[in-house]
């Protein structure tokens, strides 16, 4: 971290992207500034954002590969230049972009002689390859080569114990870290009692998301992390009664919900489609898969109903709360969407 004296202003706190470039398909760079900050605040924000960017951003990668008739990962396969271990390492480097949650299957099935690249991976519809030219293996003979793959979205660095699996599958140490590196520097500006700080933040990503998208997601994760402290504890409610209870994401929700209940204007809920609610594509797809097409369908579901939907997560509940709170001018019933 570097501190230097530079000229600056004392305007309202704001951020801006001052540089953005694509060095390669798997290397994006972005440089951002946040200013003006009081003395010490730049360090606080810089440290928190750096840790969130490196450890809290989710990524998608290949976590397991299954070969046929391979005794161990150090084996060689006739007609293939690389060993099984080298193929696993190449698969580990494949960069994927997706909004999937949970585990999905993929595969490779080709006939040699030819080079196998990431483009040869048969993926589920929700997953795409960032760099299709990434190498996997070189088939030197006319053989049929097939691999079954497992894909998962997670965060951080996941390792599994090495052991021989009877079905011929091998774990791949997953690196679910779309952000490759983060640097920040602090510059002081002003004179005397009017000194302020400017935070410069540099972000490098692997191409599965842009630095701006990574910064947004890291900021949202930090907000969600601190959000529980904004909720006042209800009087007369013990910790044991409250420990398993979900708290809506905005501390002003109860107040706004009261205002919504005062609105007696009748609205045909079956004519308001969830397409109009500005939901994220992931939340929207989850609801669509559960045959929830209108606001009436949504309000007819309980928390338990929604949580039984495949791939539906707590973040989706929060997002639905935010959206309804912002756009819903109707009288919500206590037993409707009670989460």
Curated annotation (Swiss-Prot):
**Keywords of the record:** Chloroplast, DNA-directed RNA polymerase, Nucleotidyltransferase, Plastid, Transcription, Transferase
Q: Which GO terms describe its cellular component?
A: chloroplast; DNA-directed RNA polymerase complex; mitochondrion
Q: Which residues cross the membrane?
A: none
Kindly report the protein's main subcellular placement as a broad class: plastid
Instruction: Note the superkingdom of the native organism.
Output: Eukaryota
UniProt xrefs under Pfam families: RNA_pol_A_bac (PF01000), RNA_pol_A_CTD (PF03118), RNA_pol_L (PF01193)
Its recorded reaction(s) are: RNA(n) + a ribonucleoside 5'-triphosphate = RNA(n+1) + diphosphate
Top EC class for this record? transferase
Region (Alpha N-terminal domain (alpha-NTD)) residue spans? 1-233
Q: Where in the cell is it found?
A: Plastid, Chloroplast
Quick check: keyword Heme in the entry? no
Report any one BP term from Gene Ontology. DNA-templated transcription
Which EC number applies? 2.7.7.6
DNA repair found in the keyword field:
no
Entry remark concerning the domains of this protein: The N-terminal domain is essential for RNAP assembly and basal transcription, whereas the C-terminal domain is involved in interaction with transcriptional regulators and with upstream promoter elements.
Q: How does this chain assemble?
A: In plastids the minimal PEP RNA polymerase catalytic core is composed of four subunits: alpha, beta, beta', and beta''. When a (nuclear-encoded) sigma factor is associated with the core the holoenzyme is formed, which can initiate transcription.
The protein's name is DNA-directed RNA polymerase subunit alpha
* Name of the gene this protein is made from: rpoA
């Amino acid at each position: 971290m570097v501190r230097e004296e530079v000229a600056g202003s004392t305007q309202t706190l704001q951020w801006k992207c001052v540089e953005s470039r694509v060095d390669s398909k798997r290397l994006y760079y972005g440089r951002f500034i946040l200013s003006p900050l009081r003395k010490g605040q730049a360090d606080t924000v810089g440290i928190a954002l750096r840790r969130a960017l490196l450890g809290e951003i989710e990524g998608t990668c290949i976590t397991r590969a299954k070969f046929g008739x391979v005794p161990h990962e150090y084996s060689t396969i006739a007609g293939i230049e690389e060993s099984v271990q080298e193929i696993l390492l190449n698969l580990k480097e494949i960069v994927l972009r997706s909004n999937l949650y949970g585990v999905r299957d993929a595969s490779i099935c080709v006939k040699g002689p030819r080079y196998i690249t990431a483009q040869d991976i048969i993926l589920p519809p929700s997953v795409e390859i960032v760099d299709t030219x990434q190498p996997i293996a070189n088939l030197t003979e006319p053989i049929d080569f097939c691999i079954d793959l497992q894909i998962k979205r997670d965060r951080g660095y996941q390792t599994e114990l090495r052991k021989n699996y009877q079905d011929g599958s091998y774990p791949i140490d997953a690196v679910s870290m779309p952000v490759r590196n983060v640097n920040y520097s602090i510059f002081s500006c002003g004179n005397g009692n009017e000194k302020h700080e400017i935070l410069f933040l540099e972000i490098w990503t692997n191409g599965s998301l842009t630095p701006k998208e990574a910064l947004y997601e890291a900021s949202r994760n930090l907000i969600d992390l601190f959000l529980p402290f904004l909720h006042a504890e209800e009087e007369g409610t013990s910790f044991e009664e409250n420990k398993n209870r979900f708290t809506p994401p905005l501390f002003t929700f109860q107040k706004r919900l009261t205002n919504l209940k005062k609105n007696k204007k009748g609205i045909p809920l079956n004519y308001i489609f969830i397409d109009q609610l500005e939901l994220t594509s992931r939340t929207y797809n989850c609801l669509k898969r559960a045959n929830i097409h209108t606001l009436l369908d949504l309000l007819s579901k309980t928390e338990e109903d929604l949580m039984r939907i495949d791939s539906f997560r707590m973040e989706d509940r929060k997002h639905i709360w935010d959206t309804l709170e912002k756009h819903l001018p109707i009288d919500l019933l206590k037993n409707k969407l009670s989460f």
